[in-house]
């Protein structure tokens, strides 16, 4: 994993944020969606270039998992380690291993979202605010590896910081006191293009 970390650091330092975002899209297209399924047979037949029994077994387990059986060999791994595997194009990991890591990362992200939304609804019901939600989203973003941050809008961090400083009350400052907290959270979590339009307007 240390070699993957070194390769990731070199890649991140040599590319701009925009280039890194494009690289992420390119790599993800090979392990998800049509790009993955178009090469499904080859992906399932892929074997890592190693004689290490543990690594060979891990690759086999990953193929079994992405085909609906067995346990994800990367279950419980940290998000940083998962990212190293997902975006590693050196051949150290098979396509199915990278897909399995991507699935685990997706599951962890989904669990985080469920928790932060539940906490934020409680915050909204009690105070009318979403300041803690914006803070949690910002902290989550800052913890992401550079290649994952690059997939977010350029204005994401700045706008969240602005909303945190504003400490807005969505109940008392909306029509008839019925502001939709869920709508605001959905826009932030789904990276709504109008909300993060990078032109300085505040759309939350």
What are these regions (language model features)?
Residues 1-204:
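Type III/flagellar secretion export determinants
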């Amino acid at each position: 994993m240390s070699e993957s970390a070194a390769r990731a650091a070199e890649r991140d330092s040599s590319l701009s944020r925009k280039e890194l975002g494009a690289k992420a899209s390119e790599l993800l297209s090979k392990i998800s969606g049509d790009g993955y399924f178009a090469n499904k047979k080859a992906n399932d037949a892929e074997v890592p270039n190693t004689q290490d029994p543990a690594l060979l077994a891990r690759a086999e387990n990953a193929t079994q998992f992405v085909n609906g059986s067995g346990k994800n060999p990367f279950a419980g791994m940290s998000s940083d380690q998962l990212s190293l595997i997902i975006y590693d194009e050196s051949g150290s990991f098979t396509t199915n291993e990278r897909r399995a890591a991507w699935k685990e990362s997706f599951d962890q992200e989904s669990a985080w979202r469920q928790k932060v939304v539940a906490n934020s609804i409680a915050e909204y019901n009690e105070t009318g605010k979403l300041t803690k939600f914006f803070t949690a989203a910002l902290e989550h973003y800052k913890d992401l590896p550079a290649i994952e941050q690059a997939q977010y809008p350029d204005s994401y961090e700045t706008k969240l910081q602005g909303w945190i400083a504003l400490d807005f009350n969505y109940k008392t400052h909306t029509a008839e006191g019925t502001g939709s907290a869920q709508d605001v959270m959905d826009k932030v979590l789904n990276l709504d293009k109008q909300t993060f339009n990078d032109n300085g307007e505040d759309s939350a």
